[in-house]
From Swiss-Prot:
GO-annotated biological processes: neuropeptide signaling pathway
Identification of the protein by name: Periviscerokinin-1
Keyword Secreted: yes
Function field: Mediates visceral muscle contractile activity (myotropic activity).
Chief localisation class: secreted
Key words, A-Z: Amidation, Neuropeptide, Secreted
Valine amide modified-residue sites: V11
InterPro entries the UniProt entry points to: Periviscerokinin
Length: 11
């Protein structure tokens, strides 16, 4: 889940 500030790439 990308909150904007924290970028978590889901692959």
């Amino acid at each position: 889940a990308s909150s904007g500030l924290i970028s978590m790439p889901r692959v």
